[in-house]
Regions:
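Outer-membrane beta-barrel "beta-signal"
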Residues: 47-51, 149, 229-242
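Solvent-exposed loop/turn segments connecting transmembrane beta-strands
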Residues: 35-43, 59-62, 74-75, 106-109, ...
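Transmembrane beta-barrel strands of outer-membrane/channel proteins
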Residues: 26-32, 61-63, 82-86, 129-135, ...
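N-terminal signal peptide c-region/cleavage motif recognized by signal peptidases
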Residues: 9-14
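Outer-envelope beta-barrel architecture signal
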Residues: 18-26, 44-46, 57, 74-80, ...
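Internal, conserved structured core segments that host functional sites
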Residues: 100-139
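Outer-membrane beta-barrel transmembrane domain signature
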Residues: 56, 118-120, 134-221, 225-227, ...
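Short glycine/proline- and aromatic-enriched beta-strand/turn motifs that initiate or cap beta-hairpins
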Residues: 17-65
Length: 242
């Protein structure tokens, strides 16, 4: 997956301070994704684009999942919060392998959890570090924990680009329910790197895009439904900014 690393290369001279703004973003994007992480089948769907930060309420898709809840400042640059998140399922109809194995769907669900987020600057580069735990409200679906680092890598006029790296851990129930295996050990589920970008083509309208490469680990990677251990996601859309 050498291409995945090349996606993170940007001109060093382009590094610029990106001053965060208090704004709301609402839109929609077209996404290409694997039928499930580990599938060779690639499918296309529509996803929301959302960024809203109030006091204390928030809703966003900018940290890897669709989530919303409340958050509070502990100290300048450090926030803690609780959230509900949409957890994607797995459709048998999207994969010929799942159909041949006659496996049932894994329905989408909702998780409840908490997070801690730190925002700062390293020199001219804005960075944020997110730690988050998510427990599915269906106890059989288990729990996951995320650690995500974001860094602004380009900011010039109307265009902003950020890079990120994420690691997600899962307990045994989460791995067993999604990857159709028994007696799984909990542990590192996947790691990923990606880019997010936006371009303002008017005062209120922005084009948004993202690309992500993801690698499975542990018992999930050796599941009988896993055809490949690497996957990619990409999306492009439009959003209204106010």
């Amino acid at each position: 997956m050498r291409l995945c690393w090349l996606l993170l290369i940007v001109p060093i001279s382009a590094l610029a301070q990106i001053v965060p703004e208090d704004y709301t973003l609402v839109g929609v994007a077209v996404r290409t994704r694997p039928a499930y992480d580990g599938s060779e089948s690639q499918v296309t769907d529509l996803i929301p684009v959302l960024r809203y930060y109030g006091k204390p309420w928030f809703a966003r898709t900018t940290q890897g999942v669709l989530e919303g809840g409340a958050r509070w400042a502990l100290t300048p640059g450090l926030d803690a919060g609780v959230q509900l998140a949409y957890e994607e399922g797995r459709k048998t109809s999207e994969s010929s392998l799942l159909q041949s194995l006659n496996l049932p769907n894994v329905d989408p669900g909702v998780s409840i959890g908490a997070h801690l987020e730190w925002d700062s600057n390293l020199g001219q580069v804005p960075v944020s570090l997110l730690g988050r735990v998510r427990q599915n409200i269906d106890p059989d679906r288990g729990a996951q924990a995320d650690l995500r680092l974001n860094a602004g890598v380009y900011g010039s006029g109307r265009m902003i680009v950020a890079a990120y790296a994420q690691a997600t851990w899962a307990n045994s129930k989460s791995i067993e329910s999604y990857y159709a295996i028994n007696n799984a050990d909990g542990g590192l589920l996947f790691t990923s790197i990606g880019l997010l970008g936006s371009y303002d083509f008017s005062r209120h309208w922005s084009a948004v895009a993202g690309v992500q490469c993801r690698w499975l680990h542990g018992d999930a990677a050796s599941s009988p439904i896993v055809e490949r251990t690497s996957s990619y996601y990409a999306n492009a859309g439009i959003a209204y900014r106010f």
